[in-house]
Amino acid sequence: PASYAPIEAQVTTAPPAAPDFDAIRSEVAAEPADAYLDKETREIVPSVTGVDFDTAQAQAVLDAAGEGETVSVPLLLTEPKLTTAKLEANLFKDVLGSGSTTCAGPSNRWYNIDLAAKRLNGTILLPGETFSYNDTVGPYTLASGYKAAGTYQNGQSVDATAGGICQLSSNLYWVTLKANLEIVERHKHQFNGGYMPVIGTDATVWSDQLDFRFQNNTDYPIKIESYLDKNHKLHVTIYGTDTTGIHGEPYHVVISTVPYKNTYQPKDSIPVGTEPQ
């Protein structure tokens, strides 16, 4: 049978290594951070609760503890100013401005307005960001899907690619005035289009020469909703968070009316003394 010889072992005890509270604090401490909407994804980035503790207090608690006793170090929690729940509850909850206009004209014009409205719909602007109509719904080419329809050029009504899109830019301008947003760039038409209920609320755009731009001067993100319904009525609404209660209501006043005059120009194909029928 196997034989066993006794083994002598010397047992020594030693105090545990003192914890490095500064190192622990550097691992667990966090600054509070507000929730926000990501610029690229347009999704909510959750808020962060601030975490910290007093290293001197932690050392004092440890020094006062008996052997084998479990100690707890109190954490200092700091809530951010804008939590995830608060942002979700306030995001796009208010109508800052809304307006509708009726679209007339041939089917190509309706088609262009509908296409532009679909490209505009769902646009989100963060606080301080500037919106560009041309960058959002352009380019105004056949290759990008637009068709030829009536528009004003050089004082005349002609067919041109993307004709009709100015009704959407005008409708949007009208709504931004209601929402009290900051207008950065806006150009009026040579003639009153007739589709805007208030004279002076139109906004013409074209290629890279004329744009309609405005800035989100609120403290929260804003979102644009736009669509053309089956009755050819164009709807534009801007959603956001109303923190001021200040809104605009554009109107016009007719001060005077200037009668028009006929201007006659000779044309070789028409006999002298006659007018075209």
Predicted regions and their residues:
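Well-ordered beta-sheet/strand-loop patches within structured domains
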Residues: 3, 12-33, 38-277
